[in-house]
Each structure stands twice: as C-alpha cells, then as structure tokens.
C-alpha cells in the first residue's frame, strides 16, 4: 500500500474516532465478529467524553473534515431519501461545498495552457481574485476583447489522483458493508458509490457542462420562464469554461426580491412550470437546482424570470419513464393504489413476479396518511420518496434518472414554498400534465410515433432472428430480467407500425385492394392498438 494511501487511511480513522462514528456503526445489526470489535479497538478502552451532537450532525462534520470529495459524496447521498433516515438526510443537506481558492497565478497558468494563448490576448480584463471557489473548480470574472462580460471557470489542478484515492476507499467501505450486513446490501452501497464516481468525473469535463448549458438555453430560447447564460465556445476547453456573466438576485434573498416588488406567487409557480417543462416537454432537466445555482432577473419583477447557472449535472427520462411517471402521479392523487402498483410492475421498476395485492397494500399503508393533509400541503417530492421507499422493499432496482428527478423536485418544491408558502403544487402542475397526456395521444403525436418506428422496420427481421435464437438457448424459461418488459413493448410497437404501414398501402390501392377495404381496416386497427397500448 502506498504511503499516501496509508496516510489517508489514518486520517479517516482519526475522523471516525473524533466524531464517534464507530458508535453509530456498532448500533447497527452487525454479525457477532464485527460487534466484538468494540472490545478490541484500542481507543474504546478508555472513557470518552460524550458528544452533544445528533448522529446526523456527527456524520456531516466528519465528511466536512475529510475534504471536498467526501463533502460532495455526502451532498449526493443527501438526495437518496429512499435509502437514508430522514434526520441524517436533513443534516447532509446542510453540507457546504466551499473550500479556499487555489493560487490565482496557478489559475492563470492553467487557463493559458488550455487556451494556448496569453490571458491578455483573450481578455481585456481578468480579475485574478476569484468570484467563487468550490471543491472541483473556481470562477473568475473577466471581459473578452470583444467587450462581453464573462465568467471563467477553471478546474482545480491535481484533482484526479485525489478523487481516485478517495473513491478507492469509498468502494472498499461499500463492498465491506455489502459483505457483512444484509441491511446494507438492500441499500446497494456499491451502486451508490458507482453513481457518484460517474457524477464526479463528469464534473471534471467542462465541455460537457458547456454542452448541457447550450442545450438548456436552446430549449428555453425566448421563454419568459428561464434564462440560461450564453456559452462562448471559442474559449471553452475540457478544463476551462467561458460563459456570459449574469446579474440577478439570489433566489433565497427574499428581502431584496420583496424590495423589487417581485410577484412571489408567479415566481413560485413558474419554478414548478420550469421543472415540468424540462421533464415532460424536453426530457432534459437541470439536476442541480439548489439555491446557489438559481437567480432571479431584475428586469420585470411583475413577470419574474429565473436564471440558471452550473449545468454540470443534468438528467433525462425515456418516453416510457415520462409516461409511467405521469400516470403514477395521476393514479396516486386519485388514490388508485392498485394502478400505482401495476404501473411500477409494467414499467420494470419492480420485478414482474411481484405480488400485485401485497404491493398495493404496502403502497396504501405508506401513502394514505399523506391525504390527511390539505392538497396544497402535499409534497410531490415526498410522494415520490415514499413510493420509491416502498418499492425498494419489493426489490426495486436503483433508477439513477428517477433519483435525480426526485432530488430536483424536492429542491424546486422547497424553494417554491419558501417564496410563496401557499403554493399548491398539484393545481399548478395538473393542467400541464393533462395537456402533455392529451398531446401524447393526439393524431400528430401518433403519426410521429409511427414514422419514427417505421424507420426501424429494416431491423425487424434481425430482431425476430435474435429473439428466436434466445428462445432456443438454455435458461429460456428463466424469469425474465427487469428490462424485458420494455424490450417486448418496443417490439410490439414496431410490429404495430408495420401493420399501420401495410394497412395504409392496402387502403391506397395495394396489390390486394380487390379484397375491399376491410383487410386494410383490420390492419390499421391492430396497428393502432399495438402502438398506443400501455
């Protein structure tokens, strides 16, 4: 083991001892040989002064002491309310990703290396004092030679070895937890760390963030709801991002918003509309919309517009996930728990062999108390969290895209009610969802669906051959994997498209037109059924 890794291990051990995290560990239902360690560990042989801190606060402070990589891991973990006790999740939400800035001259050197030019050749002004500094990057204000006011984001130097080292220890801890604890295995700690690994490495590529920002800007071009700063692609590199500098009011600065006479009700409702527009219209949503990344334009306080920055983390849903999510929400608010359970099974979110009656009863037990509150006080985010918590007891697979969506919804919802406490999220979202559902089954949408799937017809023969080969192989009678339901649905919709195409050809005077219109009618009817069935 390398000296650096040993030093890091000793550092982790000191933090564990300082914040009594070993006490939290031994409170868990562990195997006897691990519980016996409480009598073996040397630091437990002597009396220790008790800490007047909750378990969540101790964990939060420990992660802060361990540095930026553990801080960001804690922030991501705080969004997994389907896995964590509420008190711990609430404490982890308070983690602040603030670290001292690195040397400004080093920042200038890194920017010049990435751009291949001197700072003075690109910028007429460059502020060496950073505007902000976080664990992954820091930001400087500047002005381009062409006159535009911009911000320059630069990745911290030497991050990859630190990230690799800390991730290695996180994986070791996660694998150990899965081996020794059945309860830990249900939480899939290795999967959680794997998701974090992907997220943290994605954040190191600023070209990815630039592309996300450009896509989001294009989606809301000309919209009164949301403004996204312009990316200056000529000066963007993997470790440097140059984009328009924005001036606005921090969304949590309620006093300044009030002084501007901002319409708080409209501002809160527009936040909800932005969220549902991103999720259902665009299937591309900003997944890191905490208050530090959201501002409000000062231009029209009576018609307030949001400004979003930091698009490093985004999420997207498949059309199937969009459809099932919308239907789940409608079924939930109708208290149709059987429908909710069936939709979870149909979507492949829980195994196909799940007992519907038991799943329905579990959902009813958890969710029915929610309706004791007035409708305006019901939390969408809490609804999703409760549904996912229940589904995990029935072996629901981790759905990273739904985790991001739940996190974003909780942020938007909490923010909306902070701005306007009487925000009725359901009444605000319901018209949008109903309109989206109607558009999904409109003739135009069906035609587009048919056209897109008609393009896949050349692959139909290959799919059929592959299907026959799989059926002929051993284990063909094993229970189908979770993804099989969706594959089968896609195959049937493709078959439906073929029927629609064939029926259209017959109706237009194909080779069998002398048989009359009834064969074409049957083919079109069967095709429509297969295409729109759920």
From Swiss-Prot:
GO molecular function terms attached to this record: ATP binding; protein kinase activity
Entry membrane topology: Multi-pass membrane protein
GO biological-process terms attached to the record: regulation of ubiquinone biosynthetic process; ubiquinone biosynthetic process
Top-level EC class as recorded in UniProt: transferase
Keyword set includes GTP-binding: no
Domain of life, per lineage: Bacteria
Transmembrane stretches, start-end: 23-43, 490-510, 512-532
Name the record gives this protein: Probable protein kinase UbiB
Organism, scientific name: Pseudomonas fluorescens (strain Pf0-1)
Record lineage: Bacteria, Pseudomonadati, Pseudomonadota, Gammaproteobacteria, Pseudomonadales
Recorded name of the encoding gene: ubiB
């Amino acid at each position: 083991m390398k000296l650096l890794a040993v030093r890091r291990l000793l550092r982790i051990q000191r933090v564990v001892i300082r914040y009594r995290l070993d006490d939290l560990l031994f409170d868990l239902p562990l195997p006897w040989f691990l519980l016996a360690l409480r009598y073996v560990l040397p630091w437990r042989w002597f009396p220790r002064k008790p800490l007047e801190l909750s378990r969540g606060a101790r964990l939060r402070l420990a992660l802060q002491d361990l540095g930026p990589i553990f801080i960001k891991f804690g922030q991501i973990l705080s969004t997994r309310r389907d896995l964590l006790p509420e008190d711990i999740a609430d404490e982890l939400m308070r983690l602040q990703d603030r670290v001292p800035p690195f040397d400004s001259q080093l920042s200038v050197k890194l920017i010049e290396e990435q751009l291949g030019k001197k700072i003075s050749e690109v910028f007429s002004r460059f502020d060496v004092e950073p505007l902000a500094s976080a664990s992954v990057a820091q930001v400087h204000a500047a002005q381009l030679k062409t006159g535009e006011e911009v911000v320059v984001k630069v990745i911290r130097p030497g991050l990859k070895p630190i990230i690799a080292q800390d991730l290695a220890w996180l994986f070791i801890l996660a694998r150990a937890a899965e081996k020794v604890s059945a309860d830990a295995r249900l939480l899939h700690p290795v999967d959680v760390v794997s998701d974090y690994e992907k997220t943290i490495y994605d954040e190191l590529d600023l070209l990815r963030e630039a592309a996300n920002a450009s896509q989001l800007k294009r989606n809301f071009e000309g919209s009164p709801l949301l403004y996204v700063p312009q990316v200056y692609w000529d000066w963007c590199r993997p470790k440097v991002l140059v984009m328009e500098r924005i001036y606005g009011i921090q969304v949590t600065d309620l006093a300044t918003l009030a002084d501007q006479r901002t319409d708080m009700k409209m501002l809160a409702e527009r936040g909800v509309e932005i969220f549902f527009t991103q999720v259902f219209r665009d299937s591309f949503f900003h997944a890191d919309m905490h208050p530090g990344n959201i501002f409000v334009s000062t231009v029209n306080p009576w018609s307030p517009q949001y400004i979003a920055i930091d698009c490093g983390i985004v999420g997207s849903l498949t059309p199937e996930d969009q459809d099932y999510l919308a239907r789940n929400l409608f079924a939930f608010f109708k208290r149709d728990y059987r429908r909710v359970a069936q939709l979870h099974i149909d979507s492949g979110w829980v195994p196909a062999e799940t007992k519907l009656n038991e799943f329905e009863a579990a959902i009813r037990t958890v969710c029915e108390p929610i309706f004791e509150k007035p409708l305006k006080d019901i939390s969408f985010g809490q609804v999703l969290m409760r549904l996912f918590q229940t589904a995990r007891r029935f072996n629901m697979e981790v759905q990273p895209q739904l985790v991001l969506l739940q996190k974003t919804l909780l942020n938007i919802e909490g923010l909306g009610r902070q701005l306007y406490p009487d925000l009725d999220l359901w009444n605000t979202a319901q018209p949008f969802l109903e309109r989206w559902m109607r558009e999904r089954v409109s003739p135009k949408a069906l035609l587009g669906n048919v056209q897109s799937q008609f393009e896949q017809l050349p692959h139909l023969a290959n799919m059929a051959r592959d299907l026959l080969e799989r059926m002929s192989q051993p284990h063909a009678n094993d229970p189908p994997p979770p993804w099989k339901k969706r594959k089968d649905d896609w195959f049937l919709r493709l078959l439906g498209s073929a029927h629609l195409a064939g029926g259209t050809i017959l109706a237009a005077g194909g080779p069998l037109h002398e048989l009359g219109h009834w064969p074409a009618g049957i083919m079109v009817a069967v095709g429509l059924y297969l295409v729109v069935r759920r």
